[in-house]
Amino acid sequence: MTKRTFGGTSRKRKRVSGFRVRMRTHTGRSVIRSRRKKGRSRIAV
């Protein structure tokens, strides 16, 4: 059997796609807006 190679790093995940990073740019804010509009329980990581 092969190993699961993807571990996942919380710090990197937050830095790349966290809420504060999204709010920095216009497109990021639009992402948050659209996810709120859709009714996602998690708008950002």
UniProtKB/Swiss-Prot annotation:
Keyword annotations of the record: Ribonucleoprotein, Ribosomal protein
Domain of life: Bacteria
Residue ranges of the region described as Disordered: 1-45
InterPro entries: Ribosomal_bL34 (IPR000271), Ribosomal_bL34_CS (IPR020939)
Pfam family, one: Ribosomal_L34
Entry keyword Ribosomal protein: yes
Ranges of Basic residues composition bias in the record: 10-45
GO CC terms of this entry: ribonucleoprotein complex; ribosome
Alphabetized PROSITE patterns for the sequence: RIBOSOMAL_L34
GO molecular function, one term: structural constituent of ribosome
Gene Ontology biological process terms, A to Z: translation
Family named by the database record: Belongs to the bacterial ribosomal protein bL34 family.
Identification of the protein by name: Large ribosomal subunit protein bL34
Organism: Prochlorococcus marinus (strain SARG / CCMP1375 / SS120)
Taxonomic classification: Bacteria, Bacillati, Cyanobacteriota, Cyanophyceae, Synechococcales
